[in-house]
Amino acid sequence: MTNHCLEVGIVCAWLRATRKLHFSDMMLDMQLRESQAVGEHRPDIVVGNLAIEVELNHKRKETLTRNVLSNELNYDGQVWLVPQRKANIRRSLAEIFSDNVIEDETAKILCLEDIHQELCLCNIHNNTWQAPPLP
């Protein structure tokens, strides 16, 4: 199992614990693969009409741009979760959002470690902590 798969699982647990979403409310990229053409971009997680991306490794700016624009076209919003130490990825995403006039209300970049911390603060047995809404 890759680090990416583990992080996607952690994000699903975070969505469950902090947003009170059921796992059936989340579509993962492997589920989306069944209904999309080969080579078409799929977000890591889709909740409603929100694309959630876990970005652990630097990609060419052209690839990131293609993925951001695909999300912009196909979803009402997108959230990118990036490790703190990967400032180059966050910087590239911010430039892509700016260059393509993507609104702050529809596109967010969050620190993956903040997700970990929020999940650790949750009482997962009774969901006593409620996070602010996603875009």
Which sequence ranges carry the predicted segments?
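Active-site metal-binding core of divalent-cation-utilizing nuclease and nuclease-like domains
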Residues: T2-L64, W129-Q130
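Non-catalytic C-terminal interaction segments of nucleic acid-processing enzymes
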Residues: H58, E62-G77, L81-P135
